């Protein structure tokens, strides 16, 4: 064996030893790792200290690029009529004849979530808080859920 092959054997042995040491370290601290992950799981997709939002890129939805809480879309119970999708922009709307807009209502929370966070690109929005209807019941409800 020449000196070059001995050098490579020593480097390979050191690399394998480092892998074993790392594996043993994880094995010894596995309980602490699980406790840390359980404690901080609620912050998994929250905004980081550095100012860059940590996004879940596995599933794309309408809230991925929004950091203001009031702008995020959410499904809320509508008084007496199921559920609606709301944000500071207004409610998701149904467009009727003569381009009239009304609040899109859903029978179940699951239907609301499926529609709100689906891949629908063209979403009609109805904001009851624009003039002249600033003090109507729908506007008061929108302000109360934000």
Curated annotation (Swiss-Prot):
Q: How does the entry describe its membrane topology?
A: Single-pass type III membrane protein
**TM region(s), chain numbering:** 1-21
User: Known InterPro entries for this protein?
Assistant: Poxvirus_A28 (IPR007664)
Record's GO cellular component terms: membrane; viral envelope; virion membrane
Xref: Pfam families: Pox_A28 (PF04584)
Give a short account of its post-translational modification. Contains two intramolecular disulfide bonds. They are created by the viral disulfide bond formation pathway, a poxvirus-specific pathway that operates on the cytoplasmic side of the MV membranes.
Q: What is its main location?
A: virion
Record localization: Virion membrane
Q: How does it assemble?
A: Part of a stable entry-fusion complex (EFC) which is at least composed of proteins OPG143, OPG147, OPG155, OPG086, OPG094, OPG107, OPG104, and OPG099. Formation of the viral membrane is necessary for the assembly of the complex. Interacts directly with protein OPG107.
GO BP, sorted A to Z:
membrane fusion involved in viral entry into host cell; symbiont entry into host cell
Please give the function described in this protein's UniProt entry: Envelope protein required for virus entry into host cell and for cell-cell fusion (syncytium formation).
Q: Which family does it belong to?
A: Belongs to the orthopoxvirus OPG155 protein family.
Q: Which residues does the entry place in the Intravirion compartment?
A: 22-146
Protein name, as recorded: Envelope protein OPG155
Specify the species.
Variola virus (isolate Human/India/Ind3/1967) (VARV)
Q: Which UniProt keywords apply?
A: Disulfide bond, Fusion of virus membrane with host membrane, Late protein, Membrane, Phosphoprotein, Signal-anchor, Transmembrane, Transmembrane helix, Viral penetration into host cytoplasm, Virion, Virus entry into host cell
Q: Which parts form a coiled-coil structure per UniProt?
A: none
